[in-house]
Amino acid sequence: MHKKTDFIGIDAPHRPDTFYGLAKCFAEDLGSMYWDKRGMESVCMRILSCAQVTNTRALGTWLSYDDLIQLVERAIDTPVTGFSVVYGVSNNDRAPVDHAKASFLGYRPTDNAAQFA
């Protein structure tokens, strides 16, 4: 399990701490396998939190509804994605993850949870 203070890059190894997290890891591995074996493209989105900001942790993990819509639309509209894993997080000052990889989709998050601090 990653420490809560760790900055987690997109290429960090899977470290699930719940069965839900384990299922998400399986889905990513399944997408990778289908890309390798069948050339089926997919974009796996690691959405950290999309609910209203109610605690300090969410100041880093929040994904606004507008940014979520933009991310999904960009993933659908991008002509070639291969197999991709991206973090779904708004442009938060305290983001604990690197969401730069989503830029190839044209994703440019505009919201920031700092407004709730």
What are these regions (language model features)?
Residues 17-21, 53-63:
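Glycine-rich "substrate-gating" loop/helix at the edge of Rossmann-like oxidoreductase active sites
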Residues 84-86, 91-108:
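Conserved C-terminal active-site "lid" loop/helix of NAD(P)H-dependent oxidoreductases
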